[in-house]
Amino acid sequence: MEYSFQKMRWFLVIAIIILITEPLISFGIIEVKAVDNAKTDGLTSNSRATTNQSSLNSTFDGINHVIILVMENKGYPQVIGSSDAPYQNELAKKYASASKYYGVFPESLPNYLSIISGYPYLTKDKDPGTIAPLKEQTIVNLLQSKNMTWKGYFEDIPGVCHLTDAGKSGYIVHHNPFVYFDIRTDDRCKNIVPLDDFYRDLGNGTLPNFSFVVPSNIHNSHDSTVADGDKWLSSFVPRIINSSTFNSTALFVVYDEGQKHDKSGFGSGTYAVNGGRLPLILVSPFAKAGFVTTNEYTHYNLLSTIEAMLGLGNLGKGDTISQPMMDLMRSKS
């Protein structure tokens, strides 16, 4: 009887606490912090909460230019270790790479969207003219808030901010994530330009803080072989390495998704990934030479890394629960 009375007393105490605190929570007098959803989203090991900000600042100090170069539809084993990709393997051996890097969806567009926004807002490859522009934030908003510059460079795009395909193997609009957001409705659209502008900006020393580079469907290995894409990279990447800008640059060579070649992934929930295991190579004087990380990373980690490199903050999506890929960076002496 005494035990039952004590248990009832505790139930009464708990009930009183709930009755008192619930109105206070509702009116914002008591703040309740959300539980970190990294575990439920299957990305516990990538939790950004473990990253020390001062360590980030020190590691990425000196990087003023970040370039993302997106290739197409090839899985990790098709490129890394393959005799069809001698140049990419040369880069991986000289700089830093990831052996467990994954796309987030088995179609192109969601992966491109995720790289610049932290979320695959569209799960099918659609033309932007068929949908209203997305009003969600992207890395462009973060860059603007810091008065930093950006451009999207697209090979064979017929003109600035072009919204339709230009031939089967030329410029493909769903490889251009910027035009799916409200960026296309204002003067920011002028920053979506032909690849020739990249060569000019690089030569003039006027490369923006953030560059997003997409080759044509012939040169990105989508409608061609791994060897064809590797040959194009062997002519493009040296221009960057041999430029005066390279000393303050981080270039990421990455593929969008593995398509039928590799459908592997990991995790569950909102930010699950199933876009296949992909090559990712960091080409930079800041890269840890010859290093291969075995940590599991995704396009969300890539976005998180860009944000950390440029001191941008985050977008509150997949980037927020995904740590920067600091292990690819060499330690400051």
Q: Could you describe each region identified by the protein language model?
A:
Residues M1-K39:
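Secretory targeting signatures
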